[in-house]
């Protein structure tokens, strides 16, 4: 209901990040279908950002938006991806997108200026052709990093961590500790405060 209330007549697109950045939530097929059908009903195009799609923790499954069993929902979407997260190759200027909808594709071609990097094209091809074995070793390493952080945080009084289902990010909540030592007031007194809206 909250999501639907934010879909005004001025809303023309919705970005669905899967896995979600920064929380690491991996969307279920049912949730994606619900979001997709709601967007279709409201004539809102789904922009599916799947840049973290390969980085999913054990016990969770990534569902590509374009694989959903409702053709109308899929046709109302554009999927985006890149090698930057999976293969740690940010800056290659070689992200890509696709859609099953020829009308959306035509609109994109009309307004999108392609800006590929030659090095990025080579890196993309090399990563996808030869990087699977490397990434098969990285995935459990990243999962273990999450477990190390979660174990360490579990021993810290007043501190918690959101257990991510995907991505390599960990979000640690220090708010109880910060409040208990009045850190905000301390930062102001010492001239180290930043506007909260930056975070």
Predicted regions and their residues:
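PLP-dependent class I/II
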Residues: 1-199
